[in-house]
Amino acid sequence: MDSAFMDDIAAFPLPFCREPMSSISHMLGAFVFAVMAVLLIRRGRGDWVRTSSLVVMAASSVLLLILSSAYHLAWPGPTRDFLLRADVAGIFLLIAGSMTPVHAILFTGRSRWLTLVGIWSIAIVGILFRMIFHQWVSDAVGISIFLICGWGSLATAIVLWRRFGWTFIKPAVFAGASYTLGAIVLLFHGPTIIHGIMGPHELWHIAVLSGLTMHWRFVFQFASGLQISRPRLKVIHYQPATREAA
């Protein structure tokens, strides 16, 4: 799997940076989302479950961007090899972190906790497998696992669509589409817009930033809590007609 993320990155290096565009894009992204995290977490104050779930999503997003930026900054060697494994493992963290506030805030009972336990169990296994057995995972298998994990939330999207409507879930759907398109570009190693500057991996980074932006926009809708408005039934009182006195 390493080749999809490292060996095929054809970038013009700088003295201090192996892949400038990839590193700088996610470095700036980490800064922007760190600032946005303050606003997001403040929006969720007042309930510990809500606030904690927003912290998890914000931390997983920023951490992934930092790991990615550091990996693309480094030159070949043991440090870069480790950062590569951590960077790819961070995608599992991002998927689970992104789903955490969705189920923690919008669901209750078993729909909340059992789903979160399942999501995080898969993420932990994926992270451990990626860090320890990375050399046994091919490009296609690795990227397919990410797509399956990400689109595993389709059932959640359907439930939210039926409950709140298309306008509510539209940012989340666009986020999923952005991640998917980026993964496809990465898997097929194309297209290349400007050789050495804007290739498949740089396009993947843009897709990640776009997906994060849309998903955060989605979560901002209910970060402070969401009251489900249900239409009230109109009660019609039946009054039998009375005959007029003859």
Segments the model singles out, each with a brief description of its role:
Residues 1-246:
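Multi-pass alpha-helical transmembrane bundles in non-GPCR membrane proteins
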